[in-house]
Amino acid sequence: MQRGLDSETKKQLEEEEKKIISEEHWYLDLPELKEKESFIIEEQSFLLCEDLLYGRMSFRGFNPEVEKLMLQMNAKHKAEEVEDETVELDVSDEEMARRYETLVGTIGKKFARKRDHANYEEDENGDITPIKAKKMFLKPQD
Amino acid sequence: MAEPASVAAESLAGSRARAARTVLGQVVLPGEELLLPEQEDAEGPGGAVERPLSLNARACSRVRVVCGPGLRRCGDRLLVTKCGRLRHKEPGSGSGGGVYWVDSQQKRYVPVKGDHVIGIVTAKSGDIFKVDVGGSEPASLSYLSFEGATKRNRPNVQVGDLIYGQFVVANKDMEPEMVCIDSCGRANGMGVIGQDGLLFKVTLGLIRKLLAPDCEIIQEVGKLYPLEIVFGMNGRIWVKAKTIQQTLILANILEACEHMTSDQRKQIFSRLAES
């Protein structure tokens, strides 16, 4: 005599339970509504409409901090699109190229093994430039 | 004012929507519907002139239009909700169809997100200050919304202080919230307004007029004597000058300049400059 339920009957009972639970869930029986794309945006703020100046003002040096702020905020608001195209260089391009040239040698020397130090010789100016290429194995021609 | 009123009354009686472009600068009344430029061709006057069919689909060439204060969206049209003059601004950077709004006048302020206002601290409860901004509810201001404020380093704000801040939350469903820093965490002039000075109230339209980029009144006032002014979009102005008399003169000028013509104003300024 079997005490527990049969596996099949168990499955059936589970399925029935699931069905009851899912039918209890509510759903809206409406047709699909398509959201209309609206071309009009509503804004209640006057900031978009009119270019207003910054609200704090000071005249004839009464409050120097506010005068500085006035210049900052009003300039930001007027010249937002003007960008500085001429960026002043601190270091010229040629000097940069020269530095890089010697830099490669200096850093390379740091990682080179003792035997390879011969490759890095200092010339008159003290600039370290790698002179020779590494010695490779040359296969005999025969 | 009789002429624009009669014109408006005629159009309302005819109940025909007018094109927004033709009404720019004229007085509009609440309840009027305005057509946007793309639609006025389709609903052109009568059928007397037959328009040739255009092969390119009109629907694709619609641009986004922003309807500002005083206007609402009603289907595809704009519905006027306040009386005033209709204004339009062309888009600066090319995207969108520009902004339409109604230039109206009112004294009661309704909090709007992003507006800089002057508020008066009315209560201090725990970590929040209640600030009266002239709206239907006092705005809340957290003590952490000041520059350089931490839990240990609290800002020095007492009841009765004047605060210049901006709204971060302001809609009809929630209590307005304001802060005294910008999105980067800098104060930018916001915070507690200093000692002395005089706070008075004017209409909202005057504030916008005074803050316009080419306002002559402000330029002339600035030449009189050293002074400091703070404008709040809620109709409040705070002024301060070296002596009490100068402060009072300034307050009177700003209050009165709304109803003066430019000649009267120039007379008053020249009289002041002499004395």
Swiss-Prot record, chain B:
Matching InterPro entries: Exosome_RNA_bind1/RRP40/RRP4 (IPR026699), KH_dom_type_1 (IPR004088), KH_dom_type_1_sf (IPR036612), NA-bd_OB-fold (IPR012340), RRP40_KH-I (IPR049469), RRP40_N (IPR048541), Rrp40_S1 (IPR037319)
Keyword Nucleus listed: yes
Cross-link (Glycyl lysine isopeptide (Lys-Gly) (interchain with G-Cter in SUMO2)): K151
Annotated transmembrane regions: none
Leader sequence segment: none
A Gene Ontology molecular function term of the record: 3'-5'-RNA exonuclease activity
Pfam name, any one: RRP40_N_mamm
UniProt keyword list: Acetylation, Cytoplasm, Disease variant, Exosome, Isopeptide bond, Neurodegeneration, Nucleus, RNA-binding, rRNA processing, Ubl conjugation
Compartments reported by the entry: Cytoplasm; Nucleus, Nucleolus; Nucleus
Keyword Ubl conjugation: yes
An individual GO BP term: rRNA processing
PTM annotation (N-acetylalanine): residues: A2
GO CC, alphabetical: cytoplasm; cytoplasmic exosome (RNase complex); cytosol; euchromatin; exosome (RNase complex); nuclear exosome (RNase complex); nucleolar exosome (RNase complex); nucleolus
Disorder association: Pontocerebellar hypoplasia 1B: A severe autosomal recessive neurologic disorder characterized by a combination of cerebellar and spinal motor neuron degeneration beginning at birth. There is diffuse muscle weakness, progressive microcephaly, global developmental delay, and brainstem involvement.
Assembly behavior: Component of the RNA exosome core complex (Exo-9), composed of EXOSC1, EXOSC2, EXOSC3, EXOSC4, EXOSC5, EXOSC6, EXOSC7, EXOSC8 and EXOSC9; within the complex interacts with EXOSC5 and EXOSC9. The catalytically inactive RNA exosome core complex (Exo-9) associates with the catalytic subunit EXOSC10/RRP6. Exo-9 may associate with DIS3 to form the nucleolar exosome complex, or DIS3L to form the cytoplasmic exosome complex. Exo-9 is formed by a hexameric base ring consisting of the heterodimers EXOSC4-EXOSC9, EXOSC5-EXOSC8 and EXOSC6-EXOSC7, and a cap ring consisting of EXOSC1, EXOSC2 and EXOSC3.
Family per similarity comment: Belongs to the RRP40 family.
Function field: Non-catalytic component of the RNA exosome complex which has 3'->5' exoribonuclease activity and participates in a multitude of cellular RNA processing and degradation events. In the nucleus, the RNA exosome complex is involved in proper maturation of stable RNA species such as rRNA, snRNA and snoRNA, in the elimination of RNA processing by-products and non-coding 'pervasive' transcripts, such as antisense RNA species and promoter-upstream transcripts (PROMPTs), and of mRNAs with processing defects, thereby limiting or excluding their export to the cytoplasm.
Name of the protein in its database record: Exosome complex component RRP40
Gene designation per UniProt: EXOSC3
